[in-house]
Amino acid sequence: AAQQKQEEETLKAKAEAEAAKTVVLDSASLFFQAAQGSEQFTTLENDKVKLLISNKGGRVCQATLKDYNDQQKEPLVLFDGEDASLNLGFDGKNENILSNQMYFQAVDVTDSTVTMRLNAGTGNAHLDFIYKLLPESYMLDFTVQAVGMQNFFSPSTKSISIDWKQRVRQMEKGYTFEQRYTSLTYKPSNDSFDHLSETKDDMKSMPEALD
């Protein structure tokens, strides 16, 4: 039990350190211009869900379910504003990118698709976050694509870091019941589904890739 508690504290400390990272860009940075801007939103929707994508960080910042109502009989908002955050980190040769500090441009916009583009300061090099909301579905495809960035990334870079946080709203009138049965499910690429504890604080380190 003592060892498990120590592991949990270590994981928590690492998570807090990652969240506290700040990349300071000077005027010579490839992404100096992308670090300046004002927040704007793009809407994706189908018959089941409506999503707001923010150009700040290129992330989904609001999700509303059309077929369900909350306790006030309004469309059910799963998360909004600061309820959820997503930060992708990319290691470069001379500088690093944290997506939550950058302003993306929305291109190739339709009712159900958008590409959030982070332009580098040279040529046509850019980083794309591609969103596609599937028809008649709650599923949102998300693809990260780098174009002309081969000279930016370190040759040793094989992965990106993901810092994802979500504050789960109370949806049911019965708080105790909802808390007891709400869980976070995940799937390692070469294994079956697993989940964190529903009834207590739980943290796990995942050295393998997740689907």
Q: Whereabouts are the PLM-identified features?
A:
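Subset of Sec-pathway N-terminal targeting signals
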Residues: 1-15, 121
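Short, Gly/Pro- and small/polar-rich lid/capping loops
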Residues: 9-39
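Soluble non-transmembrane domains of integral membrane proteins
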Residues: 34-211
